[in-house]
Structure formats: structure tokens, C-alpha cells
Amino acid sequence: MCTKPSFVSQELFLATVQTLRPASAGDHTRLANSTAGNSGLWSRVSTWGLLLPLLYFALDGVSPFVNGPASMRAVSTGGSALMDRLSNVLILGGCMIFVIQRHHAVLWLSEQMKLVIFFPILALLICPVSQQVTRTISSDAVLFGGILLVFYIMSRYTVNEVLELFLVLGAATIVASILFALILPQYGRDLMGGHSSAWKGIFSAKNYLGNMALFFLTAAVSYRPRTSLFRSVRVSQILFCLIAIAFSRAATTYMLTTVYIAYATTLNAVRGFRKKDYFVAFILLFVIFASVVAVAVLQPDFLFSLLGKDATLTGRTEIWDAVAGSIAKRPLLGYGYQAFWLGYKGESYRIILTVTWALGQAQNGFLDVMLELGVGGLVIVLLLFGFAFRDAVTCLLRSHDDSQLRAVEWYFAIVILTLIYNLDESFLFEPRHLGSLMFVLACVGLKLERLRLQSFPANRAARPTLSTGHPA
């Protein structure tokens, strides 16, 4: 059972637990009538305002009219530019405008998600050893604001409303990306590194377009439209996301799109069967994963050719070897949050000289966490993944609520994709990366669904046909 946080009154705690109850058909009808009327999701000024910080995170804080090396854009100021500091303060302030509106609920979620909150706290605690203290503090503030914004979203909107938010945001950014690639190729195509035919759209790089298109695709697939208009938007968005993925030329995204399709198809096939069939589904997915690993070990050249990579994973293995040497120098505390990749300054210069490649990340999210926060940061991330998997499996095996199962399946998909993505890309706890915030959102959602399941055991036996997920 969930426990009451010390800083929240008993009334608030009971009210919060009440919001986790399974919704009845009557509740669903009332919600449908409400959303159809003036109190609907898009009649709220705050919902439209929320799209602004989400768009900022979706674009990684980079103007779509910039088409330079993504790695050097991230570190070009080395943390010294006044405008960079000012923009961080503004985005933190923008996030806090929303957070303050529901500060009690945000505090309650902070108590439930201690690991998520402790990551930026740890970054702040060890900032004295950072290679660039000002960059660490300002970036940490943005990360903290983004996390609190996620808590606000999860306390304010139902699961389907969250999906609708990402549907609208995704439709705007993906359609804009397609238009940029076709009409403004000097901005919409990745002209760096010999990828002139690859689309990047309004995003910072082709891999980022592929990453976000896939995440938006999962939201569109999981969303249940409430009107014919949103039904059309959903179908169009699925098509646009697949087009963006195809023309991003991002090999990792190709592979993960296949993984997601297999995941969604398998769970959809077993959803109407008995609970033990979920266990069978997990076994099938494990067999598929083990088969891929076996091919990678026994026939690596064949697998690499399918992914469009060579035996060094397009130079990634050389980067990882060089990064391991830097980690060995500071394994406990790292080099400071967002303070390792400083271009031709500090320890990152040694790696750039070694691999003869201008870098802004280790091409592996877990290695980047080690570089920045040492062992402590890595432990937090691994525990967060572990708890997310525990919560997901618990809900999938015990819940009989169709709406809850659909929510858990979407959250779990985001967690799985984030895990695999960060094996050869990097965005774990990035301060301005929407994928990072969606991962945090998924972890929060899985925790809330498990608490809901524990708080209302009847949900295990009952199987209501209508449910709304999280409270508005």
C-alpha cells in the first residue's frame, strides 16, 4: 500500500489516492460530456500555454533555422554565455508557473518518485567538482523544472489527455519537419557528416527526428480519439511519423520501430486472453531479443549490414573505449552534470583528439551519466529502470482493467525504447530533451498505476469496459 508523505496533510493524501481509483462508466460519461463542452481539454488556456515549454523541450532548445554540427552546438558556449544562462532561467520560470498551480500534488508525486528527484539534487550536491560549475547549475535548474512540469502534467490530466497533448504537439512538429525538409532543405535536411539526403526537419539532427517521430508514433497508436476530428488527426499522425522515420535515415530508429511494432502487435494479440498469456508474450519477446543477441555474436557482419553500420557501430566502439579511460579517472563523482562535453576544453578535448571526431555525447546514455555523475548517477538510473520494469510487469500480470492495461503498455513501451535507444544514443536526464521527459513521465505513470492497483484490489477481479486513467 502507498504511504502518506510527511509533508502532505491527511486530507490531501486521501484525495490523491482517490484519484487513483478505477473510473466507473458513469465517471467516463461525465468526463466525455465535460470534454465535449466548454470545460474540455483545449478550452483551458493553461493547456495551450503548456505546449510552449513542451515545444521548447521537443526542439532541444535549438532554433530550427540552425543547421550546424549538433555536437558542437551543444557545447559551443562552454557554459559562459549570458544568454544561455538567461534562457535557462526563463524556461525554469515558465515551468514553475504551471507547477505552482498544483504544488500540493507535485509535492506528493515528488515523495513517491524520490529517485527521479534525487538525480538533479545529486547533480547540485557534487557541482563543486564540476569542470564548469555555472553550466552545471543552470542546466540542473532546467532539468529540475522539466521534472516538476512532468509531475504537474501527471497530476492534472488523464492518460488519454496526456496522449492527446503529445498527439497535437507531435502533429505540429512532425508536419513542420516534413515541410522544412521539402521546402527549406537548407534547414530541414542534415547537411553535416555526409547525410544531405537525411531529413532532420525542425529538430537538431536526423537521429533526433527519428527518435521523436517514434515516441510520437507510440502516443498516436495508444491514443483513443474522442471526436472524428481527432480520429483523423491520429491516423494522419501515424502516417506522418512513419514518413519522418523513413526519411530520417536513422538506423537505430529503424531497428526500434521494428521492435515497437513487434511489441505492440504481441501485446494487442494477447490482451483479450488469460493473464498467463502475458507471461507467454514476455517469453516470446525475450526469445526474439535473445535471437538478435545470438545473431550479433555469431554473425555480427550480417546484423551490422542490416542496420547500415560497420563492426565499430559507425565509430561508436572507439568512442566508448576513449570514454572508459575518462571514467576511470573520476569514477565516483564524475566531471559534473552537463560539464564533460565542453568541446575543445577539459577532458572532452582528449577524447576528440583520440577519435578525431567532434563530439557532444558518448553515444551511450549510461556512459554519459557515468561521465557526469559517476557511480551514484548510474545507480539512480539503473534503479529507476528496475522499478519501472517491476511496476509494468506487476500491472500487466494482475490488472483486468482494459484502460489501465493500455496505459501501462504505452508507458512500458517508452521505458523499453529509452533503454535500447541509450545503448548507442544518449538522452538520459538531458535537461532539454523531450524524450528524457517522456521517460520520466512513463516511470511516474507506471508507479501511479501500481499504486492504483494496490489501493483498489477489486480492480484485479473486475474488468470495467470504460476507464479514464489518471485524474484531471
Segments (PLM) and residue ranges:
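Alpha-helical transmembrane segments of multi-pass inner-membrane proteins
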Residues: 91-95, 121-125, 163-194, 203-270, ...
